[in-house]
């Protein structure tokens, strides 16, 4: 009997411990298929999910990643009403047809219209009566020079010769109508002139510009939202579902626990028709328990994040590559996808995470420095940075994430035990620029492995490397004179 034989049950490997072995390939990087699954019923065009962190994903980030083909998870460090509002902003950002357009009553004022336009970031609003019959439309042009904020909308709206269409008109015909009449908004009405939707020229052009966008069956951008395990979880979920959330992520530090499993079962009883992803976990046993309880997806990663201190504070975790592989083995044949969450520094790590069995990766630090992240902008030593913090940091826990680390009953900040830190990351430009490089690296890796799609990438093989192999993998014996957009030296 020995300690190693009795207590060490597995080797723990992470991304720097291995490299993928190149294989015979008939696949060009530009031809690989990147579509995958986020959850049981939600497909992505690219395997990238932005993290439910208060310095990573709010509406602006969720819109940007969905337009690229991924999905964002809006964090829960805000009121129920505000989180639902963030979801609604994403769902209204882009539509084939807006089925529940923002409207205004004919007796409302100019001030009311301007407030709605500012809240929803829109430039025009259909005007309806109490029965939702269309009586006019008011746009920025109607209000631009109006000084009387108390004037009734029906005094300034366009009410004559309103161009409309019916629900059966196809998008090509809609484009012709908009161009022919030089209008940007086209109300959709039924045979009785009752408003049933709205089509905008902006949405049509967006659809053409971003054909890979991740959208639902109504042409709206997809978005997920995070919840914790608290007394108001179901109330929060109801508000998020009503706002249009496509999936809910039950986000905790330890998903393989009684309280989380019971909350999952309760949530599935109340919301059987919406996908619920649960995390975080690090073992196949945990994955089986969550799937048995009804999970539509699982999130893998305990402690690998750049701002996470769980492994050193609690002494707990599984190196990320091994965790992903162990969960992937357990999920084989279930149809339930896994999200590899954390530990990613380069695009090559993304390829490794997917090759180990991931269907998508959750990214935090890689995108926290982008224009679309909600983190504060910081100037330090003449360089631009953005704030980035773990949801287990003291600052985030004070703002609402205590329940993620099972400390919701602690009111004294001095008695909180953080499992994360607050930091800063270099400003990186737009999300599009970052995703472009990550996707490019993923395509290259799949080409080297001869993998035409992510399912085939799961068959790729690894070689274990030494510390010398890691050093050899990075630029060495030179001074970098021109930085690449997809590489910086590890700190």
Predicted regions and their residues:
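Catalytic cores of alpha/beta
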Residues: 60-63, 235-243, 282-300, 340, ...
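Short beta-strand/loop segments at the ligand-binding rim of alpha/beta enzyme cores
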Residues: 43-50, 96-101, 216-226, 267-282, ...
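Catalytic beta/alpha-barrel core
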Residues: 73-77, 103-104, 124-126, 164-165, ...
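Bateman/CBS regulatory modules and CBS-like beta-alpha motifs in cytosolic regions of diverse proteins
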Residues: 30-44, 51-53, 82-120, 127-129, ...
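Short beta->alpha transition motifs characteristic of CBS
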Residues: 74-79, 122, 126, 133-149, ...
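Glycine-rich phosphate-binding active-site loops on the catalytic face of alpha/beta enzymes
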Residues: 67-82, 245-257, 296-314, 344-378
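Active-site-adjacent beta->alpha loops and helix N-cap segments on the catalytic face
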Residues: 30, 79-88, 146-150, 194-214, ...
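Alpha/beta catalytic cores of nucleotide-metabolism and tRNA/nucleoside-modifying enzymes
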Residues: 1-24, 104-105, 166, 226, ...
């Amino acid at each position: 009997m020995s300690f190693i034989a009795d207590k060490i049950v597995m080797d723990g490997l992470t991304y720097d411990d291995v490299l993928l072995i190149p294989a015979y390939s008939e696949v060009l990087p530009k031809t690989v298929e990147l579509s995958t699954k986020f959850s049981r019923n939600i497909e992505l065009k690219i395997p990238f999910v932005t993290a439910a962190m208060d310095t990573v994903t709010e509406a602006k980030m969720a819109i940007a990643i969905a337009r690229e083909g991924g999905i964002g998870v809006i964090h829960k460090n805000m009121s129920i009403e505000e989180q639902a509002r963030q979801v609604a902003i994403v769902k209204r950002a882009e539509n084939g047809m807006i089925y529940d357009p923002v409207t205004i009553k004919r007796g409302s004022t100019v001030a009311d219209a301007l407030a709605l336009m500012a809240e929803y970031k829109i430039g025009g609003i259909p005007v309806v009566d109490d029965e939702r019959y269309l009586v006019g439309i008011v746009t920025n042009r109607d209000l631009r020079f109006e000084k009387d904020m108390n004037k009734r909308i029906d005094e300034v709206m366009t009410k004559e010769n309103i161009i409309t269409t019916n629900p059966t008109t196809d998008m090509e015909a809609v484009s012709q109508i908009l161009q022919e009449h030089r209008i940007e908004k086209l109300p959709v009405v039924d045979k009785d002139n009752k408003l049933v939707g709205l089509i905008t020229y902006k949405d049509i052009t967006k659809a053409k510009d971003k054909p890979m966008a991740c959208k639902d069956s109504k042409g709206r951008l997809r978005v997920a939202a995070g919840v914790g395990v608290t007394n108001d979880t179901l109330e929060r979920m109801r508000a998020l579902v009503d706002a249009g959330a496509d999936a809910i992520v039950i986000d905790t530090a330890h998903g393989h626990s009684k309280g989380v499993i019971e909350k999952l079962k309760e949530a599935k009883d109340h919301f059987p028709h919406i996908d619920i992803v649960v995390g975080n976990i690090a073992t196949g046993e945990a994955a089986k328990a969550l799937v048995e309880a009804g999970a539509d997806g699982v999130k893998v990663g305990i402690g690998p994040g750049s701002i996470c201190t769980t492994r050193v504070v609690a002494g707990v975790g599984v190196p990320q590559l091994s965790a992903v592989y162990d969960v992937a083995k357990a999920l084989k044949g279930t149809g339930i996808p896994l999200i590899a969450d954390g530990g990613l520094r380069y695009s090559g790590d993304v390829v490794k995470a997917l090759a180990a069995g991931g269907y998508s990766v959750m990214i935090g630090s890689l995108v926290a420095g982008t224009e679309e992240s909600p983190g504060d902008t910081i100037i330090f030593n003449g360089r631009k940075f953005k704030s980035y913090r773990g949801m287990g940091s003291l600052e985030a826990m004070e703002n609402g994430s205590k329940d993620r680390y099972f400390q919701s009953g602690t009111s004294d900040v001095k008695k909180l035990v953080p499992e994360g830190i607050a930091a800063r990351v270099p400003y990186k430009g737009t999300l599009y620029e970052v995703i472009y490089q990550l996707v490019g690296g993923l395509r290259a890796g799949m080409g080297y492995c001869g993998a035409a799609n992510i399912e085939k990438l799961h068959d790729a093989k690894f070689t274990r490397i030494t510390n010398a192999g890691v050093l050899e993998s990075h630029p060495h014996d030179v001074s970098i004179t021109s930085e690449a957009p997809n590489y910086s030296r590890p700190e």
